[in-house]
Regions:
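Beta-strand-rich assembly/attachment modules of structural machines
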Residues: 1-125
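Acidic, small/polar-enriched beta strand-loop surface segments
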Residues: 1-21, 171, 185, 193-330, ...
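A broad structural signal for short, well-ordered beta-strand segments within beta-sheet-rich domains
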Residues: 26-37, 153-157, 207-213, 319
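Oligomerization/assembly interface segments of phage tail-like spikes and tubes
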Residues: 32, 36-57, 97-110, 173, ...
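Short beta-strand and beta-hairpin "edge-sheet" elements
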Residues: 71-104, 182, 306-336
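Short stretches within intrinsically disordered, low-complexity N-terminal or propeptide regions
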Residues: 72, 84, 90, 144, ...
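Glycine-centered structural positions embedded in regular secondary structure
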Residues: 82-84, 104, 144, 272-275, ...
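Charged- and aromatic-enriched interaction segments used to assemble
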Residues: 94-220
Length: 344
């Protein structure tokens, strides 16, 4: 096995993928450049994307798998970085040479391209994970799996909107059960529980953050310190007067108000408890960090990573974006975030 925290030699190979068997096909020659990005942000994330430039002729569309073969002290290991649906976007012709530029989309793309006609919904009581997987299989060529523990019963029906994509409906269904979608390096789509255990320990199992100068973004400018809930003649107010909170009345020296005139308390919840709950919910902000690290197979966007290097970065974060630098090895520029509660 490769120790990915140490140096290794590697070879990059790109294979055409048979959409029927999902196995490697012929190797693609003449690959001049490769790029891969992963992004789990937004309402309907496609998760993976990329691009490549190829010398010579290449089919204008097809699935291709980007694979790394690493060698270290006699050990050999293959890691699939991404499998994407590539389409030609440009062609350059020179004196005796030609190159094609291709743009790669996630294996989820066919579900984003297909639109709902209206009336589609996932009924209450349905296994939401199985429902989502079936919808994806109806659109996508890639294998679709349901991970262990991903099944759940929908409490309420989830309706699809006419003109929305099948993928947006799938995301609505899986999020209703606190689940997520993952796309693995071989292109397999997985309906899975939201990860709760770190997939990577930076500073423990894997030592190196190559660029320890991390970008930090913690925006507290829109966090209120007073919520007023009004329900007819009834009024309830919740305030943040915690001197230890950076957004409290004491810390700011002024009130930042949110007024809700159509409150929706839970069953048995008083208006005062509702106002306090809303203030807590609105007091959660995203603590965002960015760093460069070495590549480790199997770590994907949406995973948790624990940083334990004895500095300001220490903590557990969820990976939001990954950019792969594919050269003599692989480095990953990673943006990750964690929720910070500013009032409890």
């Amino acid at each position: 096995m490769i120790d990915w925290s140490r140096s290794y030699s590697c070879e990059w190979r790109v294979f055409r993928v048979d959409p029927e068997t999902w196995a490697d096909g012929a190797r693609l020659g003449g690959v001049d450049s490769l790029e891969v990005q992963s992004d789990a942000t937004g309402d309907v994330p496609l998760l993976d994307a990329g691009g490549m430039t190829v010398s010579g002729d290449v089919p204008p569309q097809g699935y291709y798998r980007i694979a790394l073969t690493a060698r270290q002290d006699g050990a050999i290991e293959r890691a699939d970085i991404a499998t994407l649906l590539f389409e030609a976007t440009g062609r350059e012709v020179g004196r005796g040479t030609a190159s094609v530029t291709l743009s790669g989309r996630s294996t989820l793309w066919p579900a984003q391209a297909r639109l709902l006609t209206g009336g589609e919904y996932a009924p209450a009581g349905t296994d939401g994970a199985a429902w989502a997987a079936a919808l994806l299989r109806s659109c996508c060529h890639a294998p679709v799996e349901v991970a262990d523990g991903a099944g759940f019963a929908l409490r309420d029906p989830v309706w699809g909107e006419a003109g929305a994509s099948v993928l947006s409906h799938v995301w609505d269904v899986v999020r209703a059960g606190g689940r997520t979608l993952r796309v693995m390096g071989d292109g397999t789509i997985v309906v899975a529980p939201l990860p709760t255990v770190p997939a990577l320990d930076l500073g423990g199992d894997f030592a190196a953050i190559i660029d320890p100068t991390a970008r930090v973004a913690l925006d507290v400018s829109e966090v209120p310190n007073r919520v007023t809930a009004i329900d007819g003649a009834n009024v309830a107010v919740a305030t943040n007067e915690d001197a230890g909170s950076p957004v409290s009345h004491q810390a700011r020296g002024y009130w930042y108000d949110v007024v809700e005139t159509s409150p929706t308390p839970a069953e048995g919840e008083t208006l005062g408890a509702y106002a306090a709950r809303r203030l807590r919910e609105l007091s959660v902000v995203s603590d965002e960090r960015e760093w460069v690290r070495g590549y480790v197979p199997g770590v994907r966007v949406g995973d948790l990573v624990r940083v334990a290097m004895g500095g300001a970065l220490d903590g557990t974060y969820r990976i939001r974006t990954m950019g792969y630098d594919l050269g003599r090895g692989v480095t990953v520029t990673e943006r990750a975030s964690r929720e910070v509660q500013l009032w409890v």
